Design a protein with these regions (language model features):
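N-terminal membrane-targeting hydrophobic helices
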Residues: 1-161
Length: 161
């Protein structure tokens, strides 16, 4: 799922459930960082688009980077836009970053055959084709709708999501 907002559906559900303990902005940034390698692969014409970045090790390292740069960037953006929000803690940044990178790897493993998501533990991609691409997209969109409805409900009830 390169360069698509469909990855954001599960993030919206996580934000709705996790509240101030989950940064949706850092989650979104992690999605972008995860797809730098496939973008370079498309531009360069590589045979394998989803390489090391889409493995357990890659998700861990990119998650760490996403948390470290995502917290200060997100804090600055929210302040610049004067958006009322909970303080962005390191816990929220790390939760958003690591759920972002590991969910990205898992979702892409269902869709892309060129992955080795469990490397270095296992070679190959046993998850590919477990569900259809249409079912995967519906799942992600459904989670996004669920998350949005939950956030709206919390906002109406408490005045803050």
């Amino acid at each position: 799922m390169p360069f698509t907002p469909i990855h954001l559906g599960p993030g919206a559900a996580c934000k709705a459930i996790g509240g101030r303990h989950f940064s949706f902005m850092v989650f979104g940034g992690a999605q972008v960082l995860m797809d730098i390698e496939p973008l370079l692969g498309i531009i360069q014409g590589w045979d394998v688009l989803h390489g090391y970045s889409h493995t357990l090790v890659g998700a861990l390292l990119i998650g760490l980077l996403a948390a470290l740069i995502g917290r200060p960037i997100s804090t600055w953006v929210l302040k610049a836009l004067q958006v009322e929000h909970y303080p962005l803690t390191w816990l929220a940044a790390c939760t958003g970053a690591f759920i972002g990178t590991f969910s990205h790897t898992g979702l892409d493993a269902l869709m892309h055959s060129d992955m080795n998501p469990w490397w270095p533990l296992v070679d190959g991609n046993g998850w590919h084709g477990f569900i259809s691409i249409d079912e995967l997209h519906l799942l992600c969109l459904g989670l996004g709708v669920f998350g949005a409805l939950l956030v709206v409900g919390k906002y109406r009830r408490y005045g803050r999501a």
